[in-house]
A protein has these predicted regions:
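N-terminal secretory signal peptides that target proteins for export/translocation
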Residues: 1-22
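Alpha-helix N-cap/loop-to-helix initiation residues
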Residues: 10, 65-66, 105, 267
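N-terminal export leaders
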Residues: 22-28, 42
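Sec-dependent N-terminal signal peptides
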Residues: 29-34
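C-terminal segment of classical bacterial N-terminal signal peptides
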Residues: 36-44
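Glycine-rich phosphate- or other oxyanion-binding loops that anchor nucleotides, phosphorylated ligands
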Residues: 48-56, 80-341
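Mature N-terminal segment immediately following signal peptide/propeptide cleavage
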Residues: 57-63, 69
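Short Gly/aromatic-enriched secondary-structure transition segments
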Residues: 72-76
Length: 341
């Protein structure tokens, strides 16, 4: 408001015949600078919709994960907002917007919220790779978790002679890994004095049922590196838990703790925070994760780079089959512009 008022004062002064030419030139430059500042302020503060068509957000973390999806998309246009490139178009008969979140939790949460603010998002889908934690699964398998946790939201406990000492407010936990004691995230809601505590974010049941209905029909690519993958044919596994955190897990002992404690089939960096954002915005969410390895199990170097294309493409294959069968969702908007069920 101050900038706009100041611009008005300058314009009134410019209209005065008593202003000298040099002074007038200075005021003209000042007006242009103020107009530019007002425009930038408007763009920075207003999360304006750039598209009114209801769309499914399809998210991947980094370039290899979305190659197969991007090449299959019929692109209408691209939008660049806050340095994020959004590809607008259609895929498998559905209106979509594709984008890369960037790797890890903050990037994922930030970019997905940005998409929700600027597009009319009806569903959020993640397609990408993950490390396996279930020893019964193999590289190339696609896991579709029914719930997600930010498992490294935690207390690092104090070590005493009697053992680990944790704050009284922590309460009961699922199980610790040394000094690491996981606990629920807190979610603020308008009109509530206390935040909601939530450890698991459930996948939308309709989306999960759709995934189950197509899982057995999907033909995944086989792993050609038998020395790494073994002889198992890749398959889709629907159900079970998944966890996400800021750490790249390449430690077999820690991976075993993840599986024993959370019964998680996979570990990654983005799915749970995206599930968190989707939950807060009342938007259905699901993730398709192709396994690039059993975390920490490689005899030599980590095999993620060797198998990321297989894992990415298999996740994309499942995501496309899912999109074809996903029923349309009626959506409305509340007064804030957020999509609601």
């Amino acid at each position: 408001m101050y900038l706009q008022a100041r611009q008005g004062c300058i314009m009134r002064e410019l209209s005065s015949r008593s202003v000298r030419p040099r002074r007038r030139k200075t005021l003209q430059i000042a007006t242009l600078l103020l107009a530019s500042a007002i425009l930038r302020l408007h763009r920075a503060t207003a999360a304006e919709r750039v598209d009114t068509v209801p769309r499914i957000a399809i998210v991947s973390a980094y370039e290899p994960e979305w190659l197969a999806l991007k090449s299959a998309t019929s692109v209408t246009r691209t939008e660049v907002i806050a340095d994020v490139t959004y590809i607008v178009g259609s895929l498998e008969g559905k209106d979509v917007v594709l984008f890369l979140s960037g790797v890890s939790e903050v990037n994922a949460a930030m970019t997905v919220q940005g998409a929700i603010d600027h597009f009319k998002i009806t569903h959020v889908i993640f397609s990408g790779i993950a490390g396996g934690t279930n020893p019964g699964l193999s590289a190339g398998d696609v896991v579709v978790a029914d719930r997600w946790s930010e498992y490294l939201e935690s207390v690092f406990a104090r070590k005493t002679e009697a053992g680990w000492s944790v704050p009284k407010w922590l309460g009961k936990t699922l199980g610790n890994y040394g000094m690491i004691f996981p606990y629920a995230v807190e979610i603020a809601h308008p009109g509530q004095s206390k935040p909601e505590k939530r450890f698991w974010f459930d996948v939308d049941p309709i989306m999960l049922e759709t995934a189950r209905s197509v899982a057995d029909k999907v033909k995944l690519a086989a792993c050609l590196k038998q020395d790494i993958c073994g002889g198992a044919r890749p398959r889709v596994v629907v159900g079970g838990a998944g966890v996400s955190g800021p750490a790249f897990v390449d430690n077999a002992e820690f991976r075993r703790w993840i599986y024993d404690t959370f019964k998680a089939n996979s570990v990654d960096n983005e799915s749970a925070p995206i599930a968190h954002v989707a939950y807060s915005n009342h938007i259905p969410f699901i993730a398709f994760r192709g396994l690039s390895d059993l975390a920490g199990s490689d005899a030599g170097e980590n095999t993620e780079n060797e198998l990321e294309r297989l894992a990415s493409d298999n996740a994309a294959t499942m995501a496309r089959a899912f999109l074809r069968d996903l029923p349309a969702r009626e959506s409305s908007e509340d007064s804030s512009g957020k999509t609601t069920r």
